């Protein structure tokens, strides 16, 4: 069921609407789909390839392979959305887009955890006029998930 839901998300992102650009050309739509696919019953380490840059996807898959090989935690021992091991997102997530160039920018996600305001940032990239993809998760405290995963 989870795979079917994830495939539906990818299909909706990539399917062009009549006379409109595909939803994947809206960075906030991609960020929301990534968040929804990697929380709840989703899996951060197995996002749909369409939602993440090749480099970030490779890093996430590497962490999954390490966890399976080691039969436990490898590099990531916390929930990047919570910037901690425990807690819950208490408010609806608000998204905002900050463009840096035609092929790079950042989606800011605002929400509350433990009654504190959190801002998680998703650097976004795209090739030419293609689809936007998540390239990293910058936690509320500023930790880069991609840099953490690059550590030996």
Which ranges hold each PLM region?
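Surface-exposed, charged secondary-structure patches
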Residues: 22, 60-116
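Catalytic toxin/effector domains delivered as secreted proteins or via bacterial secretion systems
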Residues: 122
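Bacterial N-terminal signal peptides
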Residues: 7-15
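Bacterial N-terminal signal peptides that target proteins for export
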Residues: 1-7
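Short, well-ordered alpha-helical segments enriched in acidic and aromatic residues
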Residues: 42-71
